Amino acid sequence: FRYKINRNICQMVKDTPDRINEGKTVGNSVVDDKVIAEIAAHYEAIIKLIGEDTAREGLLKTPVRAAKALVYATRGYRQNVHDIVNGAIFTHEGSRMIIVRDIEFYSFCEHHILPFFGRISIGYIPDGKIIGLSKVARIVDMFARRLQVQERLTEQVCTELQKILSAKGVIARCTAEHL
């Protein structure tokens, strides 16, 4: 057997405390306790509807854990590009394409709410302004952390970079697969 570690899930587990939303954040996003509790109640109902016993030892905390995981995985709805970029736009005299390759992303398909994941490479031709390379990856992550399709994800990232940088051109290549 081959095992592949999903770093994203490991990070999600690390960022998500056992207590409901202590400190009001889940994965660096502000979330109300009521939202977590309401989502958890829906997960509990779903678990019952599929025929499981929510009082079973292994499932006692599952609704709350699943609610926190969903909130973390959809944190892109509570983020904005302005906060991500945080003024990290710099003047640049060059005119050669800047490329950020193989940015890993994880998202949920909007059709079945099942995970999909992949890599996206972004290139842009600057027109006097550049952005830190890590910010490009964070912008990808923000849009990926929403219910998505890969075509829209790609378009949103390119459109946002164009808006931020007024680049001469932006291009992306995205490959993804569903679970």
Model features per residue range: what roles?
Residues 1-3:
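Aromatic (phenylalanine/tyrosine) cluster motif
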